[in-house]
Amino acid sequence: MKILKLPWLTHQEGQRNYEIYTVDVSSDGQRVATGGLDGKIRIWSVADILVFAKPKVSWPAREEQLRKPLANMSRHTGSVTALKFSPDNKYLASGSDDKILLIWEKEEGAVQPLFDMENDLEHWNVRRRLVAHDNDIQDICWAPDSSILVTVGLDRSIIVWNGSTFEKIKRFDVHQSHVKGVVFDPANKYFATASDDRTVKVFRYHKGTDLSFTIEHIITEPFQGSPLTTYFRRLSWSPDGQHIAVPNATNGPVSTVAIISRGNWDTSVSLVGHDQPTEVACFNPRLFEHNDNHERGEEVDGASKDNSAASESSGKRRLKDDDRVDSVIATAGQDKTLAVWSTSRARPIFVAYDLTSKSVTDIAWTCDGTALFLTSLDGRIIVITFEEGELGKAIPLEQNVEQLHRYGVDKDSLVFPESVKQLILEDKARQYKKPYIETTLLESRIGTVKKPNVLNPRPKHAKNDVAVASIPQAQAPALKKKEGPLNAATVQNGKKRVAPTLISTGYARAATVKFEPRSSIDSDFAGKKEPLKDTSYALAGKISQPSLPLPRLGVHTLIMGVKERGAERFYVEDEESMDDDAEVADEEDETKNEHPLTLNLKTTPERVWKDEPNLRYLEYPGVIPDADVVICQYGDLDDLHILEIRNGVERSIQFDREALFENPTKILGYHQGERTLEAFLPEVVISCVGSKACQCWALATASGSLYIYGNHGQLLVPKISIGHKVIKLIAWQHFVIAFTETCLFWIWDIRAMKLVEKEISVLPVLVQDQPQCNRVRISRRILDFRMLADSHELLVEMSDGASYVWKRALGCWTDTIGQSTPVTA
């Protein structure tokens, strides 16, 4: 083992060495990226750095060229706190305390120098600039197949991104404090997050048509006494998928690294070896052969021995059940100490004290597991190299994947829960599966004579019971014109017809047809009723048959199927066939249940509810923006009430009930610096208003519901279902006025808890122009509406200056300016 402290391997500008927060090595082992307080990302060559681990006589002659980084990127405006290469080495994701996530992509080809500036050997471009976090980004992790990217930060959020398009898929606000670490399962089933709320949450995700996420388990026991003074909680998942190592845990008064077992999520094992809280834990990406020379009584997980007999027996059981492989993990933190552990030992392989002068921030292994990169707040990048076999005998990388087969790494368990028995049954079923016979798309859709296509109509009654003809294969002779008379055939009505010649054999004479007995029928029809033959099959001996029958509706139906409506009219009724009668009855039921033709797709219920609210009748609508957080307020500076609305899903999926129950809308109320209201709604809030007179909040949802909450969180009235989307809410004295997208007014008296007006249509005063042709054009909009102070009647002001009052006694709108005739509703 060698420890390299290279003086030029830093983030230095002038005389200052900036703190380094993150380091990561690409999966091909060629590049290492670092980021720090200077806001720059530097990419180094791993091979050039490891050259200095060899004797000095073997160093290259011009070693100064090796001391320069391959690239310097400075697009962040703050400190770079997280870096991760994608598993396919195509992208580099970087996060900063400027709340921005950048996706970098290496530009191929030579880089042109600019003026007299030093030229980088590599040039990386920013492909995407992603803005979604409200605070510092603390950690980044890619899925093993690069399909998903997850970022966490100090805003308590977990954001899932698409790994190819980099669109935001989901946002979780399930932690109650800063989220400081995230890691993916190498079997591509879970990802785990660590937070300052002293919990580790394990998320399970399914890859189907849409990604779905569920919280599998929440671990709290090892972190109940963990301090909140660490910069990071960078956890790691073992390459065999069995364990998660989480730093900054405690075992009584001792600072430890918790080891979480997969499946039952047991936390009885912990690594005791640090005097102060740990910041990072990182597993070696390689697995090693199990060493039988170690003491058999030591626990496999490389932890402190538990005094209970149950823990000892579980450790021995894991030793027997394991596939005889060991994994190696490195841990470091605020005590400036690096400890390297093996799952076959209870004590560390080695401990390097005072390796740095300040806290260690990040650790990264090379892909072959022979080198370790370590960063710290003193601005150093320390490299530790190991000789071959020093950590153990590494097994081939192919066997790493075999260790993950027990968890279904090459399968997508979409329906059934993960279990070993299920995977064993799948392997047995695969052995008995019939081999797949490759066929072209045309042949598989057309069928054969023995297996007619399902689109071919079957007659209900067969007059002639003729055996199926089998045409032997024959080589087609050279194309030449047929000599002699054409084939003549006599059909059932006595008329003579010219038999067509088979196109596939050119102008050759028709092949001799050989009849086979019924026993030679395809075995697929053995258990079914004998199929009825078409009358054309009766001429099999006289007319040449095509090898592949064409469908009745044409060749184009092979590409895009056509559903026949009322298909029973093509059949002849057969009293003797009960099965056919049942089929016809089913088809008639399907025909009756078909939906009628819709003339206006905009008025269908699905379209009305899924579209955005219609705002064309309002000059100033009150729909809140489709953002992650929306702030509403009422009152003055001395008595200010604030409501924070966090919709759990976006408007595009606002009617996905499953997504809403998993991520409900969160309502938070604040007054004088204290939280006074906290509620969860399984609906998307689209409008909100606060009433100072009644000290309450009115919330309208996309499903046509109205919630009225008091300032202290109580629901004043049960949920009010209007059935229309409310696009503007107004609080006037102790009244709440709602205006819907269908131009209807609703008025409630909150103090008296009663409905004042309902379904008052404003269309009679909106539509003043005569309709032309079949289209009605509305040239005015509603500018404002309120209640009259003296009569408590509804007043509506238009954009053209006109105003109208709703007369409750008359049941109509009246003009407030002139003495015109009342406009009836």
UniProtKB/Swiss-Prot annotation:
<feature type="compositionally biased region" description="Basic and acidic residues">
    <location>
        <begin position="294"/>
        <end position="304"/>
    </location>
</feature>
<feature type="repeat" description="WD 7">
    <location>
        <begin position="355"/>
        <end position="396"/>
    </location>
</feature>
<dbReference type="InterPro" id="IPR001680">
    <property type="entry name" value="WD40_rpt"/>
</dbReference>
<feature type="repeat" description="WD 1">
    <location>
        <begin position="15"/>
        <end position="54"/>
    </location>
</feature>
<comment type="function">
    <text>Required for replication-independent chromatin assembly and for the periodic repression of histone gene transcription during the cell cycle.</text>
</comment>
<feature type="compositionally biased region" description="Acidic residues">
    <location>
        <begin position="574"/>
        <end position="591"/>
    </location>
</feature>
<keyword id="KW-0539">Nucleus</keyword>
<dbReference type="InterPro" id="IPR055410">
    <property type="entry name" value="CAF1B_HIR1_beta-prop"/>
</dbReference>
<dbReference type="InterPro" id="IPR019015">
    <property type="entry name" value="HIRA_B_motif"/>
</dbReference>
<keyword id="KW-0156">Chromatin regulator</keyword>
<feature type="repeat" description="WD 4">
    <location>
        <begin position="174"/>
        <end position="213"/>
    </location>
</feature>
<dbReference type="Pfam" id="PF07569">
    <property type="entry name" value="Hira"/>
</dbReference>
<dbReference type="GO" id="GO:0042802">
    <property type="term" value="F:identical protein binding"/>
</dbReference>
<dbReference type="GO" id="GO:0000785">
    <property type="term" value="C:chromatin"/>
</dbReference>
<dbReference type="GO" id="GO:0000775">
    <property type="term" value="C:chromosome, centromeric region"/>
</dbReference>
<dbReference type="InterPro" id="IPR006141">
    <property type="entry name" value="Intein_N"/>
</dbReference>
<keyword id="KW-0677">Repeat</keyword>
<dbReference type="InterPro" id="IPR031120">
    <property type="entry name" value="HIR1-like"/>
</dbReference>
<feature type="repeat" description="WD 5">
    <location>
        <begin position="227"/>
        <end position="270"/>
    </location>
</feature>
<dbReference type="GO" id="GO:0016480">
    <property type="term" value="P:negative regulation of transcription by RNA polymerase III"/>
</dbReference>
<dbReference type="GO" id="GO:0031491">
    <property type="term" value="F:nucleosome binding"/>
</dbReference>
<feature type="repeat" description="WD 6">
    <location>
        <begin position="309"/>
        <end position="351"/>
    </location>
</feature>
<dbReference type="Pfam" id="PF09453">
    <property type="entry name" value="HIRA_B"/>
</dbReference>
<dbReference type="GO" id="GO:0016539">
    <property type="term" value="P:intein-mediated protein splicing"/>
</dbReference>
<keyword id="KW-0853">WD repeat</keyword>
<dbReference type="GO" id="GO:0006334">
    <property type="term" value="P:nucleosome assembly"/>
</dbReference>
<keyword id="KW-0678">Repressor</keyword>
<feature type="region of interest" description="Disordered">
    <location>
        <begin position="574"/>
        <end position="595"/>
    </location>
</feature>
<dbReference type="InterPro" id="IPR036322">
    <property type="entry name" value="WD40_repeat_dom_sf"/>
</dbReference>
<feature type="repeat" description="WD 3">
    <location>
        <begin position="132"/>
        <end position="171"/>
    </location>
</feature>
<dbReference type="Pfam" id="PF24105">
    <property type="entry name" value="Beta-prop_CAF1B_HIR1"/>
</dbReference>
<dbReference type="InterPro" id="IPR015943">
    <property type="entry name" value="WD40/YVTN_repeat-like_dom_sf"/>
</dbReference>
<dbReference type="GO" id="GO:0006368">
    <property type="term" value="P:transcription elongation by RNA polymerase II"/>
</dbReference>
<feature type="repeat" description="WD 2">
    <location>
        <begin position="75"/>
        <end position="114"/>
    </location>
</feature>
<dbReference type="InterPro" id="IPR011494">
    <property type="entry name" value="HIRA-like_C"/>
</dbReference>
<dbReference type="GO" id="GO:0005634">
    <property type="term" value="C:nucleus"/>
</dbReference>
<dbReference type="GO" id="GO:1905268">
    <property type="term" value="P:negative regulation of chromatin organization"/>
</dbReference>
<comment type="similarity">
    <text>Belongs to the WD repeat HIR1 family.</text>
</comment>
<dbReference type="GO" id="GO:0000122">
    <property type="term" value="P:negative regulation of transcription by RNA polymerase II"/>
</dbReference>
<dbReference type="GO" id="GO:0006338">
    <property type="term" value="P:chromatin remodeling"/>
</dbReference>
<feature type="region of interest" description="Disordered">
    <location>
        <begin position="294"/>
        <end position="320"/>
    </location>
</feature>
<dbReference type="GO" id="GO:0003714">
    <property type="term" value="F:transcription corepressor activity"/>
</dbReference>
